[in-house]
């Protein structure tokens, strides 16, 4: 294949999987350049990272850098997004989407440090990730070339990729038996492909990688006590934790009880729809806790505004627009709204459900004295009449004019 640009040194986002194992020798052959592998540890698991540096070198990389991004990802990307209440298309807690900007940012930093003049990713031309990576690259390193092999090469199947490596005597642990495409980090794991490609097929047990089947979960419920300060979880079950520690702890609880499963068909940015089974056990529990405290402390107008910001934020994050003025502004607005989101929540975990059973806050606007259905001495119900007449005045005038 002809070179599109002259490249001397490229940093490739490397996962150790089949695609990126092929990309390293392919880059050397087609761009005649030095290839440096960059691995982002975002909590995908020790098994995924074991021996990954040696694997990258064996594939032809001159160096391999591994960056531990777990704590930063949760504290600087996931927790701020949670404050917006973002749920893409009403269900998805954006597990893959939120990991991409920090990976791209760290990849750019490595490129700067080693003097690279190009960046490379292994995203396909059908998905959202190519846009997320390249959108971040454009915002952070517009001077660097971007190489997207899946949009250039003529390899079209796993079999061809395996043959490519075998012809070059490059070791690879991948096989043809892989049916599902999975992406995991500390926050979630996604499963796509296989039986899920037909929306009339019910997900089978292979579609769920982490969580216990809710029907097989313990028959005894379990409660967790969560402390929230300024819209972020700071302690669980009486123990102070970092954001990443919170996620790890609540993942363990949620996995055990089958919490956090969704099976959705979503609108990709590239125009097509895709189906996936997503598991976000700890994140589901955290989200329930934050929304419960918001119910107590946000007034009607603030709550409505936060909901609007959450919808917009979900699309910005999903669409790879993290490094934009609008996303920065929304995060700043929800950070301000979160200043009073302080409180304690108790959540019961039982067979796939995370149910808030108790909540309290020193900033609560809820008043039992005002809200009671019994007798009270603080609320004069006759005052409502004047308010209703003014509130409905425009409707009254419109009706009178139509006669």
Swiss-Prot record:
GO BP terms: argininosuccinate metabolic process; L-arginine biosynthetic process; urea cycle
GO cellular component: cytoplasm
Keyword hit for Transport: no
Keyword field: Amino-acid biosynthesis, Arginine biosynthesis, ATP-binding, Cytoplasm, Ligase, Nucleotide-binding
GO MF assignments: argininosuccinate synthase activity; ATP binding
Positions bound to ATP: 13-21, 40, 122
Domain of life: Bacteria
Residues that hold L-citrulline according to the record: 92, 97, 128, 132, 181, 190, 266, 278
Location(s) in or outside the cell: Cytoplasm
EC number: 6.3.4.5
Pathway in which the depicted protein is active: Amino-acid biosynthesis; L-arginine biosynthesis; L-arginine from L-ornithine and carbamoyl phosphate: step 2/3
Binding residues for L-aspartate: 124, 128-129
Catalytic activity annotation: L-citrulline + L-aspartate + ATP = 2-(N(omega)-L-arginino)succinate + AMP + diphosphate + H(+)
Pfam families listed in its UniProt record: Arginosuc_syn_C, Arginosuc_synth
PROSITE patterns: ARGININOSUCCIN_SYN_1, ARGININOSUCCIN_SYN_2
Family: Belongs to the argininosuccinate synthase family. Type 1 subfamily.
Record note on quaternary structure: Homotetramer.
NCBIfam families: argG (TIGR00032), PRK00509.1 (NF001770)
Protein name: Argininosuccinate synthase
Species assigned in the record: Aliivibrio salmonicida (strain LFI1238)
Name of the encoding gene: argG
